[in-house]
Design a protein with these regions (language model features):
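S-adenosylmethionine
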Residues: 1-164
C-alpha cells in the first residue's frame, strides 16, 4: 500500500506535501512503515473516513487523487475470483459509495486545482457514470489526459467510443 502516495511524493522532488488517508488502521500502518523505511519526509499518513468532511481541507488541495474503493474488475487477471463474487447489487452499491465520497472530497480542491478520479475497474457505473455524476453535481469539468499518455497507451477512436 502507498504506491500512488510515494509516486506523488517523488514527483514533488522534496517540495510540497502529500497527505495519504485510508479508512483502516491496517493500511495506514503499512503506508507509515513504507514511509519510514523509504525516508519520505513530505508524506503524512492519516486514518480517516472519507465520508466525513474535514473542514480544515476545504479548498486547500492543489491536486487530489481520489483512489476510491471499487470492484476491482480491471484486475481480474490477478484476482480471477472477483468476477464470481461480485453481484450487480454490489456493483451498484460501490458506485454509490464512490459518489458519496466524491460528494465530500471534491470540496477539498482549491479553485484552479485538479482532482484525479482513479479506479481499477472496467465497470461503467463506477467509471463513466460517476464521471458524469461529477460533472452534473460539482463545478468540476472533465479534462482529457490524452496529451499526457505515451503513444502505446492511447486508445484508438473506436475503443474510446465504446466507453463514452
Amino acid at each position: 500500500p502507498g504506491g500512488k502516495t510515494f509516486h506523488a511524493a517523488d514527483r514533488l522532488h522534496g517540495t510540497g506535501k502529500v497527505l495519504s488517508r485510508d479508512l483502516t488502521e491496517y493500511k495506514t500502518d503499512l503506508i507509515e512503515e513504507n514511509k519510514d523505511r523509504m525516508c519520505y519526509e513530505n508524506v503524512e499518513v492519516q486514518q480517516w473516513d472519507a465520508l466525513v468532511e474535514d473542514e480544515s481541507l476545504l479548498e486547500s488541495v492543489d491536486v487530489l487523487l481520489a483512489d476510491l474503493p471499487c470492484s476491482g474488475l480491471g484486475i481480474m487477471g490477478r484476482k480471477n475470483d472477483i468476477k464470481y463474487q461480485m453481484t450487480q447489487q454490489q456493483l451498484s452499491e460501490l458506485a454509490q459509495l464512490q459518489r458519496d465520497i466524491l460528494s465530500v472530497i471534491w470540496k477539498y480542491v482549491k479553485p484552479g486545482g485538479e482532482m484525479i478520479f482513479s479506479t481499477c475497474t472496467l465497470n461503467r457505473g463506477e467509471n463513466i457514470e460517476n464521471i458524469r455524476w461529477i460533472e452534473e453535481n460539482t463545478p468540476m469539468r472533465l479534462v482529457s489526459i490524452e496529451d499526457y499518455l505515451p503513444e502505446t497507451l492511447k486508445a484508438e477512436q473506436e475503443v474510446r467510443d465504446i466507453y463514452s
